Structures are given as C-alpha cells and as structure tokens.
Amino acid sequence: MIDDDGYRPNVGIVICNRQGQVMWARRFGQHSWQFPQGGINPGESAEQAMYRELFEEVGLSRKDVRILASTRNWLRYKLPKRLVRWDTKPVCIGQKQKWFLLQLVSGDAEINMQTSSTPEFDGWRWVSYWYPVRQVVSFKRDVYRRVMKEFASVVMSLQENTPKPQNASAYRRKRG
C-alpha cells in the first residue's frame, strides 16, 4: 500500500524503560541497529499495526507495554536510490511513519526476538535516550531526531519520577 507520492505507510516504535533508556535492536545478521518498525496493512489502523509489529519483532503484547505518546504528524524519509526497487509498481521511494512511544511495564525477560519465522532482529540492548539519533543509518537520522525531540519531555518526566538511591557513591563502594 504505497501512497500517491511513493511513500509506504509504516509505524515506528520507541520502547523505553522506567529509567528513560530506550530499546535499541540489531538487525538480523547485520551490524546496523534501529528501533522496531513495520508496514501498515490495508484496513489496519496505525495502532493495530504497532501492536502487530511489536509482537512480530520483539515478542511483546499489549499487556507488556503502555502507550505514552504518538507523533502528532506522519514523518517521512526517502530511501537511498540504491535501496529503491525500481522494478516494482508502484515504486516505493520511502516510508511515511507514525511513531509510538511505549513504556515496558513487564520485565526484560518478556522480550523475544524469535517470534517470527523470519526475525527482523537478533539482539537488543538498553541505551541512553539520545544515542539512537547519532547511531542510526544516515537516511533515517532526521526522522529519528524529530521523533526523539517530540517524545523527550515524556521520557524525561519518567526519569524524574524514578526513585534514586539515597547515597549512590556509598552504594558503588559496597559493591566494588
């Protein structure tokens, strides 16, 4: 389902933990990392597509997450010419995305990259909030910057509400 401008409707998913870190996933068999994302099927809403992709790509269901926000507008990026499949009709020149910010409310153990017969990812880790903007492939960087800027206040409020150890330096000394 490609629009008149050549963009495929898609959802992007930023999953954060209670500390304000975000899930960063490694593409299967590659050295590139990104947030989960995927196409919207005909007749499917963006939210329905998000929950489907969430399960297909990282094994999480509705009960494992809480929606904190979604982008106000659709955000678009163009594919590099070398990635455009010119022999398909209609030609897809990029993605237009609705992004969702989710908080993981279950444990990390619920994350499972192997729920699909063709997994998108083969690993993941928690990273600092702005890390993905610097690390994502260049053609997605502007969209990532806009998404993270739009969601920043929500994630920062989570961090402010997370209890901090009373004496962090003493805690480090006791452990080490």
Curated annotation (Swiss-Prot):
InterPro entries: Nudix_hydrolase (IPR020476), NUDIX_hydrolase-like_dom_sf (IPR015797), NUDIX_hydrolase_CS (IPR020084), NUDIX_hydrolase_dom (IPR000086), RppH (IPR022927). Optimum pH is 8.5-9.0. Changing residue 53 to A: Loss of function. The keyword Magnesium applies. One of its GO terms (cellular component) is cytoplasm. Gene3D superfamilies: Nucleoside Triphosphate Pyrophosphohydrolase. Its EC number is 3.6.1.-. It holds the Pfam family NUDIX. Belongs to the Nudix hydrolase family. RppH subfamily. Master regulator of 5'-end-dependent mRNA decay. Accelerates the degradation of transcripts by removing pyrophosphate from the 5'-end of triphosphorylated RNA, leading to a more labile monophosphorylated state that can stimulate subsequent ribonuclease cleavage. Preferentially hydrolyzes diadenosine penta-phosphate with ATP as one of the reaction products. Also able to hydrolyze diadenosine hexa- and tetra-phosphate. Has no activity on diadenosine tri-phosphate, ADP-ribose, NADH and UDP-glucose. This is RNA pyrophosphohydrolase.
